[in-house]
């Protein structure tokens, strides 16, 4: 599979801004936007929470990987990945080989603040599905982030999304992506 720089994968922890920034970035670049989780929900006719509850995480991850594969031939598309998709070794390799990976990075406290009122994040609930305290949410995010961050850090481009206006983040990303694509184009001419 040949790497296609115009297929852009946004990765990062839940709450890092992928679903918010993704459509704006796609519009800025003149690309399409696809939210992988939303696509899975449409295909299954169920929310991610329902899929996790009924089929379990392993079944969800398998479906996530299969759905991801259907997107790999696209061009000029920004794809928002689920926060845990890159934990799957095959999905990680597919994404790295297929396109440009962009890591939207935020600190634990910011992620916890953004996610504290969300009820649709199955990995941020207690063992019996109960709502966690702010401290417990921060601890769980820190644990998951420690596991996922080595994969996130393999991204082609990293942008901090903390304490920035969304428009500024989109402008910075657009510049970095355009610069990255020019660099790739120049190196392929040599």
UniProtKB/Swiss-Prot annotation:
Record-level GO cellular component terms: cytosol
Localization per record: Cytoplasm
Residues the entry annotates as binding substrate: 37, 61, 83, 148
Per UniProt, where does Mg(2+) bind? 19
Q: Which cofactor does it need?
A: Mg(2+)
Cofactor: binding details = Binds 1 Mg(2+) ion per subunit.
State the oligomer form and interacting partners.
Monomer.
Which protein are we looking at? Shikimate kinase
Tell me what organism the protein belongs to.
Answer: Chlorobium chlorochromatii (strain CaD3)
